[in-house]
Every structure is written in C-alpha cells, then in structure tokens.
C-alpha cells in the first residue's frame, strides 16, 4: 500500500512539475525531490507524534529483509535508531539538491551530476540499513567510489582530479582494514555467522577479538577523519559546493560512526581499551583548532571545523555513549550543510573568491537571508541557549555528572575544551565575516560600529562565554573536583610517577615562553598531550582561561564605555537610537 501511494505521488509530482517548471529536463528531478521531501516530512511527523503519544518505546522495533541470490544472503534491517538517522540524512539531501539546481544550472553535464548524486545517497541508505558483513562492505565500497566521482567532478582541473584520487586511495586503506576484520570474524565464527548482532565472540580467541575491533576502529577512522587519516577532507573541498555540503556534513564523514554502531554492543567488554582515545581526540582537537586559526580559505575553514566536530562525535560514541555521539552528528549535519550553502552563495557572488579576509564588503551584496542563516548556524555551533547545540552539550555534561568512574576527569576536560574551542573559532569566523571591515576602515569608525545584528551577536557570544567560564570555575572546580573527587586526587598523589613530573616541568617552560610572546592559546601544541597529563593542570588551565577572558571583557567594557561617551557627546542630537543601543551594550557588559 505504501509503495502504491509512493508511485502515485511520483506521478502526480511529475505532472505538477511539468506545469510548474516547464517541460524540460529539470521537471522530473524537481518534482521527484519535492515528493520525496513531502513523504519524508510526513513520515518524520508521524514518528514524532507517535513518540509523543506512546513514548520512546515506539522506536523499539526491527524489520528484517533477507534476499537470497544463489545461496548468497543479503540482509537489511530497519530499526528505529537507523530509521531516524536515515530520515535526517535524506531531508538534508533534499535541501542540498534544491541548492544544487541553483549552483549547477548552467552546467552542460547536469544530468550526470544528478544521477551520481542520487546513486550516492541511495548507497548511503543501503549502508545504514545493512545487517550483515556483505551488504555493509558493498555499501562502504560504493560510497567510496561515488564520492570519488563527486569530488573529482571538475576532472579537467588538475587539483580536483588529484585530490579526488587522494580521497579514494585513503578510503582504500579503510577497505583493506574492513576486509581483514571481516575475514578474521568469518574464519573464527564460521561462515554461517554473518550478521552483526549474532557474532559468536565466545568462540573466538581474545587476541582475535581485540585485533578485529582494532581493525574496525581504524577503518572507521579513515571515513570519520581522525588524526593521521584526516588529510583527505580539506583537500576534498575541490569539488562543487553541493558535494561538499552533502559529503562533509551528512554522509561520508558519519559512515565510520555508523559502522561502529553496528558492533557497539561488544565494545562494553573492552571499554578500557579506548582509554587512549582521550589523548588522541584532544590532540586532533587542538591541532585542527590551530589549523582553523591559520587558514583563511573558507571551504578549508569549514573542513577543519568538521574534523573537530566529527572527532568529538567519535570520541563520544566510543568512550561515553553511542546515542550522545549520534545526536552530535545529527545536529551537526544540519548547521554544517547550512554553513556550506551560505558560503557557497557568497563564493558565487564574489566570482569564486574563497579568501576569508576579502569578505569585508559582504554587507553591500544584499544577501540578508544568507547573513541571518550564517548567524543562526554559528550560534547553533556555539551552543547558544535554547538551540539544538545547547541541548546536545547540556545532555553530555549532565550525563558526565551522573557517571562515576576513574577517568571522568579526562572526559570532563575534553568536553570543556571542545566547547571553548568551538566558541573561539566560530567567533574567529564571525569576526572576519562581520567585523573585519570595521577594523580596517578608520574613516568613519562610529558609523561602521552601528551594525545591530553584528554587535548583538558579538555581545551574546561574549556574555555566553563569560557565564560559561564562571559556571565551569564555580561548579566543576570548586564543587565537582574538590568535593566529589577528593578520593581521586588522593589516589593520584599516591601513585604519580616521574614521567608526569617531567611533563609538568616541560609544560611550565612552554607556558612561560608562550605567555611571553602573547600566543598561549594559538601556539599551544605538544605531542605529549597523548600521555594524559590533564590531572595536574586541570585547575591551572581553567583558572588561566578564566583570567584571560576576564581581562578581555574588562578591556571590551572600557572600549564600549568610551565609544558610548563619544557617541553621546557628538551624535546625541542626531541619532538617539544609537545612544539607546550603546546603553544596551553597556548593560550587557556590566
């Protein structure tokens, strides 16, 4: 019955598309996307209403489809968790396809692009619904193949073809690891035990289990851009903007997390095995934040931001909870696709210019909606109150407060550093897109500072960072650490070693040197952070961050006070609304 209604909707959409968009090639594609989007919205609304009425147990279902091709079984499963992810990915795909019509309208090979685009999304859906090793491997291979076609779509450009092959060959590393892991599991369990949920790990040797899980994690790292295997993602930005919005926001970068979610139930037995990922995730977080600060290419900027977000999602999936990590990349795909589309519009307007420092005249292009979408995406990434990012990170911190195990301090430290770094590099992007013109033009500085949306967003982010830093100082340091975990500190003081003391001395020397040059946070990078020396410096680093932020806000308050006095004396009789606006700024900073 559902297929009959779906075919009816497709026929109706094709007829209506012919009348609405004209009898041309785009009629079929636009009508098909519209109908699929309507059906997805109906299904998603039905699921949300069902959850509100019957609770989350409504998602506890599992539909299995088994296909027999000459004794070769292909098994697909549809559960509530994977159906929810698939609906979100397809909704993002529909939005990106509408933008792709605008972006690729004058391309001679638009039909080929749309066909590859659709096949890529179908392969992603097949990979999400896969239930055994063969279907998962087929979906994994097809995703790598068609991602190469999309990244190197402008094959006549040398760098597009080169970076497409680079992404393809790095993906082949993951394919080899996946084949090895599946071969070990097949040989140890028997060829009849092929599904993910019926692996007979009790019949396997412990070293085989450990080695196969290590191979699966390494395979997931190739797609989810962890440290050492992340080099393909910034270079893959040579493809079209719709390809970057789909691959780097919603599909290819989350394949590793989805692969690990298939066998997540067996990770509980080796939880301590992933303890080293704490230092690994922090290393790539600091490294990619530094790359963001020293990179002025817009597309590469978003790529490095994607690496930070996906690496933290992988860390949450492996070390905390699979559903928290999945929630992170679900909200990430929406705001990151929005960010790609908005930046793609500005790249079109500025004739292919991608240098972030040259966007200071964006206010004269008239893209009001694009500016509002950019502000909304940045505020969502910064986790401003009552947005999706705020609820995700609040749920993460609440879960960490409820948990109690020996490495909770490291988890809290990574979460706090991730939140702070996210706000810092998003403020960096906001500064270059909205404030750089005010800094470099000294003719009429007061006029340029009277931009309501920019100043309001700046005040909101600054106030949020100040309150968040105060919250971390009071709650985590004074209450959480010294009250709830005094036993942990006494245990650590009894069992410290010489290597921790050596790292402490090195850190003090580096801190003094960086503080002398005034670049403590932008140049801080030490490979020894893998060794988890956070226990000693947790309180010190938070206090330093708090003092720096307090000094920064004090300077900003004095500057705005001087601007307010100057504006009040000079422009009072002409622009009363500007005086009122600076009164609001003064109240916020006080």
From Swiss-Prot:
One GO molecular-function entry: NADH dehydrogenase (ubiquinone) activity
Q: Name one GO cellular component term.
A: mitochondrial inner membrane
Gene Ontology terms: biological process: ATP synthesis coupled electron transport; electron transport coupled proton transport
Signal peptide range in chain numbering: none
Q: What is its EC number?
A: 7.1.1.2
Which membrane topology term applies here? Multi-pass membrane protein
Q: Which UniProt keywords apply?
A: Electron transport, Membrane, Mitochondrion, Mitochondrion inner membrane, NAD, Respiratory chain, Translocase, Transmembrane, Transmembrane helix, Transport, Ubiquinone
The protein's matches in InterPro entries, at most eight in alphabetical order, are given as: ND/Mrp_TM, NU5C-like
Q: Which protein are we looking at?
A: NADH-ubiquinone oxidoreductase chain 5
